[in-house]
Amino acid sequence: MESLLECFAITDGKCHPDCLKANNEQEDYDACQSAALVAVSLISSARVIFKIDSKYTEYSPQYLVDNVGKEEVEGEMDQPSCQYTVGNLLSYLVENVWTKKEVRQREMDQQRREFTVKDCFEFAFKKGLPRNGHWAHVGCIFPVPPFACQIPRVPMKGEVIEAANVSEALKLGMQQPAAARLHLFSPEFDLVGEGIYDGPSGNETRYVGLRDVLMVEAEKIKGETVFTVQICYKKKTSFVKVSTRSMILPLNGDDESQVTEPACLLVDFCIPRFSIN
């Protein structure tokens, strides 16, 4: 296994041309990739804040994409096919890397699962996480090798703490950065720039959906609580100020029959609370 980890270090994030092409064709990260990226960022931050890690350590988001929600196989690590041997490595290359891209992509699409940042936290506390350089990059199109279960993981102990509203989220944010999901409307979000994103503004508004964000700061602007969030949208990371006032959100177009009850643009607040021994 040490030789495999050494290979990861030598390749230093380089990937197969098919991976590069697939990633370039993907306009934005999908929901699972986004959730995993936010989760590992918050885990890394929290572990430094509470002095569990002596320095900021990046953990693998793709490990979460590959494994959260996956059915567990009892005794997997003891199976012959899950041992890191030259024979198993060659079998993997023949069956996966040297097959046609279309076959691989079809298999990946069939195995795709949906999960949230909270699911990622819970999985990390249960199974631990490998360091970022010890697993595939985000968006890797190749199946996980059976022997990848032998890759060492950093154990994590803790629980997920959730906040039901903005007031509770403010308290969470005083201790460490928190995760949330943001209702995205276009073109308002695309045009916000240095201003405050305050949701839909007219009949031309289009609801994009929920996006995972990191809440990094709260402040009062003209008497209103405003959160600064970090978001990766269309694969570009930016910091945006978001209004916390409640409003009517047309989540399915501008048909009044689809308008929901007053809600906040930010929802689903949570943090990973680590146990400190």
From Swiss-Prot:
Q: What triggers expression? A: Target of TAS1 (trans-acting siRNA precursor 1)-derived small interfering RNAs in response to temperature variations, thus reducing both basal and acquired thermotolerance. Repressed by trans-acting small interfering RNA (ta-siRNAs) siR480(+)/siRNA255-mediated transcript cleavage. Highly up-regulated in seedlings exposed to heat shock, with higher levels of isoform 1 than isoform 2. Induced by HSFA1s-mediated (e.g. HSFA1A, HSFA1B, and HSFA1D) promoter activation.
Q: Does the keyword Nucleus apply?
A: yes
| Compartments where found | Cytoplasm; Nucleus
Determine if Nucleus is one of this entry's keywords: yes
Q: Which UniProt keywords apply?
A: Cytoplasm, Nucleus
- Tell me the Gene Ontology biological-process terms attached to this UniProt entry: heat acclimation; response to heat
Its predominant location is cytoplasm
**Free-text tissue specificity from the UniProt record:** Expressed ubiquitously, including in seedlings, leaves, stems, inflorescences and siliques.
Gene Ontology cellular-component terms for this entry are: cytoplasm; nucleus
Family membership: Belongs to the heat induced plant HTT protein family.
Assembly information from the UniProt record:
Interacts with the heat shock proteins HSP70-14 and At2g33735/HSP40, and with NFYC2 in both cytoplasm and nucleus.
Give the protein's biological function: Mediates both basal and acquired thermotolerance via HSFA1s-directed pathways (e.g. HSFA1A, HSFA1B, and HSFA1D). Triggers the expression of HSFA1A and HSFA1B.
- Recorded protein name is Protein HEAT-INDUCED TAS1 TARGET 1
Organism encoding this protein? Arabidopsis thaliana
